Structures are given as C-alpha cells and as structure tokens.
Amino acid sequence: MDTMANSILGQEITFLKLDTRVIKNFDKVLTNNIEVVETSLWSVVRKNALKKGAAKALQACASSVLHKRSDYEFLTTGNVLRKKIRLPRLFGNKVISAAYSWIKRVQAALLLDYLKEHLSQYDWDQLIVVVFNGSNYPESVLAEASKGFKRVFVEDGFFPGTLQIDPVGINAANSVPRCSAFYKSGRDFSEGGLPTAVTNRSSKRKFTPVDLAPGFVFVPFQVPSDMQVTLHSPWVKDMYNFYDIVVNAAEQNPEEMFVIKEHPRFKRSVIGSRPPHPRVKFANGNITSELISNARTVVTINSTVGIEALLLGKQVITLGDSCYNIQDLVLRGNDMGRLNAALALRGWLPDDELRRQFLGFLWNYYLVKGSFTEPPTALASRILDCFELDSEVRGAIANLNN
C-alpha cells in the first residue's frame, strides 16, 4: 500500500478511493499517496480469493448470490431508480428491473465484504477515504464500508472551477452551516471577494431563444435521476410532477408568468406530455444567466441556479432540501400552500449582509478551487484542510449556542 509522510499531520497517511472514472485524475495529483480499489466483479472475486483463500471466497460468492434483499438493496436503489428514469420503457419492465437489481445487489454484497475486511487493516489515523458522491453503487458501498474512518465526499462545486470536498456529505447533506447567526458572528467571510462566474448550461439544441418580458418567475428544471431530486426532494418527485406544480401555481397566482428551462443533461422533455398553460412558457434555448437576471424570483428544488440567483441578489424560493435553506436567505415553498405564500411576498429580498457572508464563506472557505478534470495540485492538503474547517465551524456554532 502506497503511503506518504504528510507534512501537515506529521504522520503517514493513505488516501483510498475506488476506480470511478469521474475522479480518475485525482490519482495523478495524489500519486504515491493513494490506493485505488478496482471494482470490477472479476477483480473483487480475485482479491477475495487471494486474501481469504479459494474456499472462503467461494463461500462469499454463494452468500452474495443467496443474499437477503433488504441487506443490500439500500446500496443499489439509486442505480435502479436512475435506470427507470433514463430508460423507462426498458426498465419499466418488472422482470428486467428485478434482474438488474439482483445483479447490482450481488455486486454490492461482494464489494462490501471485500472493502470491510480490507479497511480493517488500517488504523483510524492512517487512512482518509475519498468517496465520490456516495449515493450510487459502487461509491455507496465505499460510503457504507468506511463508516468509522476519516473520509471525505467529493462532488462538483456550486460555481465553475470548484469542488465540494466535505467530511460530512455533499449538496443538501454537506457541512455548510444553516445557522444565519454563524454568518453574522463578526468574521468577514466575503473579504476575499465573491465569485463572478456562473454556469451557463448549454441550451437544448432543438429550441431557439424566446422573447420574454422581465419580471417572470424562473423555474430551472433539474436532472430527475440526480441525487438532488431522488434523495433531497421530498415533495417534487420528477419533472412531470414539477410541471404540474408550476401549472397549479400559475392557476393560483394569475398575475405571474412562469418560465421553465429544462436541464440540458436530461434528454427527455416534459413538453407535449401535459396540456400547455398560457402563463407557463419553456425557454430551453435561452441563456440561464440572462433568465436569472431578468426574473423577479427563482423557484428551484435545490439547484445551484438558486445559489447563482443569490449572487445576483434575487429572491429565491426552494422546494426541496438544500445547503442554502437558511432563514432570511431564501423562502421555503415545500408544499403548495407555502409556495403560494412565498410567491405572494413580491417585495421580499434576501438579507444582503447574510447573502454576502454566505456566498463569501462558500467561495473563500468551503469550496476547493479545481475540477475533476483539473484537480488542484495540492489536493492532499485541500482534503486535510476540510477537516480543519469542519472542526472550526462546529466550534463556532457550539459557542453561539452556549
């Protein structure tokens, strides 16, 4: 196992991750400091045989094949749901869906058995586990196996060229403080400046821009198979459901025009699946930043578009769980009654000091500058920094509560 003499902690540390393609470039900057676990079925079976011997490896295989469904289903639910959303005709077939689910559970059982035994060789202070997202197999298995070890979860950041690296979780499950008092406790988090760039998602190619009068309600749709929807959206279950909610809101708020932009990464469209509404328009060909700029409010489940809207000082209404669900920063609309009540607050704007402090904390302290294709060269130090930040934040919040 490759190790490093870490100059910050003064002890040897190994970073362990899976061979997930998205974070492959982490290997280059961590070089000899990292152990990469191969996750192919053959590789896991082979390693189990080398570690346990052929007889025990066969026993593990038999156990995985004859597993109790409830023991591993939670590790593969995201994979099955994603297939059903992306390929509804194929995976809507109960036989195909059940077969795929069983295969994934067998893989999860074998990988979990291997990882638990492999990780048991490490002392707690020798290892940092790097989990990409953690919501789907195989990363969900690593997240389960690494409980009790120091670990970080990684995901895209909220602004271009940034990453989330967090010891607690990512997106709505991350460690970003939800306490508005934290951001007003005296420290100027925005002193280092605020981000200036937002992510302009490429438009769906078959649509052209539409002319819109300013002052509309902008509703950015999200990828329904993404964890932001499947795990962190108790009310809105998919984009068809979201469209129905928007139409309902339009009926109950006759003075409002609602403008939807579908996420370009999701290739299926809601258009044509529901009757049109005269005050609900699609703007799939328009530029996201311009839609935010011209909107009077942004209604989102929990998209990063909400954070981008805060950067422009816009009113934001969230329907799902998010790390920016902070009192006086956004309005909550997690059911129809609350959504209508929030839409009625036409003059409401986020507390400007809180807004700047929150964005400054994200930009100057929380987010790591870099990307999956070009991770920071000092990635090891950035990972270690996130533990320090988490400890500091917890201490500050504890002091506020005393």
Curated annotation (Swiss-Prot):
One of its GO terms (biological process) is polysaccharide transport. The keyword Transferase does not apply. The keyword Cell membrane does not apply. Coiled coil: none annotated. It comes from the Bacteria. Signal peptide: none annotated. Keywords: Nitrogen fixation, Plasmid. This is Protein FixF. It comes from Sinorhizobium fredii (strain NBRC 101917 / NGR234).
